[in-house]
């Protein structure tokens, strides 16, 4: 029998929950509990660090880069990561070489990923819509892409060429004219970003890549600057120039918007720069929730929980189930699979953290209530009639339906975007899409007769709000 670590049927919070020595994950019993929204938000497992705590460290970095540009960004990189590239902008020859040297199987897989993502995102394009409110009175909503976008691709525990694809594809589909990818320099590659990142950029047709990472990368994207002008060892200094970046050897043109995931320092920098540029979101650690019943395969459930825990020690893995048998079997499967997991120390820490748990509920209806309150970045539905259950989900970054739609598929080749809202923000936010990179502009076009027809109402409302000059602007048009 599965025995949860804590029973919240009457009271309690997550402050003291931890797994027992025999269980990789903590257990929470919500059976019989009153599942109000407020109570669930305080009781459900969630980790992540508070961005506010690192703002004092990040603010001087942003200020220095704003004042001194590339020199400051490169100095911070050398101090934090022990590597200082010759310049910020990567020569196009390095992109060509990275693609030529890329393992053929990886290249083929990336091409499949790109093709499938492009197919899905092409269908997200919006068309202009004109509404006619009367003779000579129209309002058109015109969709205009952001002009220049910076796409941040992290480096750390793993290399993420998939993040290049997931950020670039919707931006290109939206019609963004100028894209720059920023990724940390790597000492083992002579200060260049990881070659797989460079190869992915080249496959996507992106020719502007900056070798800069962390908070300093976000600041440099936001404020721009002047590159060092130094040559990269082994590459010609004849770097490509583009319309968005005249004299590309020198000018680092600031962007209008920054997207892409990163650590807490990257997130803090995005917060500090968002008065100057747009951002996609303040992403927290990745998370998976699985809503499963007795029909689910515990080996699959355990494997999927482990797969997201592999990202980060702060990653959240949550199973919600009305089945004690499934909870016990999944707990046993986790214990069996963990020893053979390559990144088992990282995974063990994530599964054992306060952000992860196996949650018992009374029934499937209660489970749906719980996962809607949790609002997971990734939500798997492994139940009987999974499609019907998925139709009742109102808060999730992405929903994966049935045993053959695991989150790993969405991370790479489902065609969906894997840049998704975290930390419960799926209650009010969406994942990255073509819409992220579009601005809706209302174009108002009225004739004299159309304005006259509604002028009395405008004047009345202006007087009601004590804004007489508004009404006068209407009257003067009809004075003779």
From Swiss-Prot:
Its EC number is 1.1.1.23. The keyword Repeat does not apply. The keyword Chaperone does not apply. Coiled coil: none annotated. Pathway: Amino-acid biosynthesis; L-histidine biosynthesis; L-histidine from 5-phospho-alpha-D-ribose 1-diphosphate: step 9/9. Transmembrane segments: none annotated. GO terms for cellular component: cytosol. Residues 1-25 are annotated as: Disordered. Catalyzes the sequential NAD-dependent oxidations of L-histidinol to L-histidinaldehyde and then to L-histidine. This is Histidinol dehydrogenase. It comes from Mycolicibacterium paratuberculosis (strain ATCC BAA-968 / K-10).
